[in-house]
């Protein structure tokens, strides 16, 4: 496959991993907040890294016996997080946009066109609300 991962479905639909999840990720200084609802169990190979690490006991991640979620490899980022990932985690959105713009500039041989900062006040408030609700600092 494209990524050095293996995903298998565990049992039946009753074996889904469902609920809120909080991650620490190199893409964001703030905890990454999301919701997971998946039956797949994903194991990462040695050539990829996780999107993030499950913080505390909030969430499952790639497996019910691990503490990581998602995958990162070069310009590819994957995660089981839903709900709504980018609007509750503006730092992740900014990192993905910056990476795409840098790649575009490199491919076109032009100067990197970084975007100016936006007011992330409401998005940061949504992140803070969920962290408080889930008991995560």
Each PLM stretch: what is its role?
Residues 72-137:
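Acyltransferase
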Residues 1-69:
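Pocket-forming structural segment of enzyme catalytic cores
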